[in-house]
């Protein structure tokens, strides 16, 4: 049983949602974002610290069928990536989901876009069932799945922040526009340490 606030120093109402930090989205992968390898050490450290302070950690994964509609061979915009059960769909080491973490697989149907961690998944219900009120979004890629997940978290009435020191984009030039859009609609922008501290 997850404890409620203990002495005011735990963040059990908070969930860290780590979006799509998978082999195919990292350097050397089929659809790599920029500078992803530099994301891994601070993200791994922050995941451990968030857990230590009582936050729920959620990992989302693109988990596509081989005939997914988003693939170029099927008329979509993207190269084949994150096919269910393949190495490219695995979390990028050293990240690893623990037994206490929530793993959300998205884009699992042929026509499911799966940009958002909330799109045709159980994420909303998982968070509500665990009493979560705050969501911090990190991961890949800022202008696609991070953006979509943050917007859906806000729409679902979670206190939502994008952790701007723990995100990576396909095109860095898009980041200022995306973050400005998110801020305008009510998503908070925060560095990871400040977000964790604010949940106490």
Each model region followed by its residue ranges:
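Ser/Thr/Pro/Gly-rich low-complexity, intrinsically disordered segments
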Residues: 1-2
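Active-site acidic carboxylates
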Residues: 5-108, 124, 129, 133, ...
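Histidine-anchored nucleotide/phosphate-binding helix
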Residues: 46-47, 147-155
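Catalytic-loop motifs flanking and including active-site residues across diverse enzymes
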Residues: 87, 91, 142-149
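Active-site rim beta-loop-alpha module in soluble metabolic enzymes
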Residues: 107-118, 149
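Short, small-residue-enriched loops and turns at beta-alpha junctions
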Residues: 111-114, 167-171
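A short, well-ordered alpha-helical element
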Residues: 120-122
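Glycine-rich anion-binding loop/nest that anchors nucleotide
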Residues: 132-145, 162-167
């Amino acid at each position: 049983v997850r404890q409620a606030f203990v002495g005011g120093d735990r963040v059990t109402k908070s969930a860290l949602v780590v979006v799509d930090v998978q082999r195919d989205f990292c350097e050397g992968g089929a659809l790599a974002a920029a500078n992803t390898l530099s994301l891994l050490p601070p993200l791994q450290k922050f995941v451990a610290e968030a857990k230590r302070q009582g936050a729920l950690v959620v990992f989302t994964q693109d988990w596509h069928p081989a005939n997914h509609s988003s693939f170029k061979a099927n008329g979509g915009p993207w190269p084949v990536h994150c096919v269910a059960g393949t190495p490219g769909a695995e979390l990028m080491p050293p990240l690893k989901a623990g037994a206490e973490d929530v793993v959300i697989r998205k884009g699992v149907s042929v026509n499911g876009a799966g940009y958002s961690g909330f799109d045709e998944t159980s994420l909303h219900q998982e968070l509500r069932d665990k009493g979560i009120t705050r969501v911090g979004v990190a991961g890949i890629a800022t202008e696609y799945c991070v953006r979509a997940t943050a917007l859906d978290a806000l729409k679902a009435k979670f206190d939502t922040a994008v952790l701007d020191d723990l995100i990576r984009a396909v095109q860095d030039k898009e980041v200022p526009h995306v973050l400005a859009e998110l801020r305008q609609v009510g998503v908070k922008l925060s560095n990871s340490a400040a977000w964790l501290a604010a949940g106490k």
